């Protein structure tokens, strides 16, 4: 079977770097899907719906592609948190998160245009937040990093200082679960090494 082009339907530099780390050089084609039109309150369902909508928006442009869509949210006490809209929201979010445990959900969708198949899955990872001071929160938010990430933190950046531990898939917290991606590729009868550049 011919190996399709690997298309990443995301503007996330972290997701692209994760793929590059394991030898996959994706064609990046960010989706312009308006996430605000989806009103789902269960985080596992929400990230799968959003990831699928993103992938489906991009897929028609690549008739022989394998299109990956992803979406991440953080849930604390059942409340869903995406990217904060501004610094004030990021500060308030961190005041809520500090000393708490959250669940980071990432939806993963692969649309294989060659086989006309779609896989939709999600991964969840527990994140244990440090109990940091207001001063530290303000300094972290001032870096701008929390405004770019679901959950208002980046495990691969300054945010790693404020995460006590994670339970589950490390790469899932950064933006996509590499083990889940490998499993999904196998389910589509590909070997991840087929995509190595």
From Swiss-Prot:
Main location (coarse class): cytoplasm
Keyword Cytoplasm recorded: yes
Gene Ontology BP annotations: nucleotide metabolic process
Co-factor requirement: a divalent metal cation
Function field: Nucleoside triphosphate pyrophosphatase. May have a dual role in cell division arrest and in preventing the incorporation of modified nucleotides into cellular nucleic acids.
GO annotation, cellular component aspect: cytoplasm
UniProt entry tagged with the keyword Transmembrane helix: no
Chemical reaction(s) catalysed: a ribonucleoside 5'-triphosphate + H2O = a ribonucleoside 5'-phosphate + diphosphate + H(+); a 2'-deoxyribonucleoside 5'-triphosphate + H2O = a 2'-deoxyribonucleoside 5'-phosphate + diphosphate + H(+)
Lineage of source species: Bacteria, Bacillati, Cyanobacteriota, Cyanophyceae, Nostocales
Subcellular location per the Swiss-Prot or TrEMBL entry: Cytoplasm
Domain of life: Bacteria
Protein name as it appears in the record: Nucleoside triphosphate pyrophosphatase
Listed InterPro entries: ITPase-like_fam, Maf-like
GO molecular function, one term: nucleoside triphosphate diphosphatase activity
Ranges in a coiled coil: none
Location of the active site: 71
Family per similarity comment: Belongs to the Maf family.
EC numbers for this chain: 3.6.1.9
Key words of the record: Cytoplasm, Hydrolase, Nucleotide metabolism
UniProt-listed NCBIfam families: maf
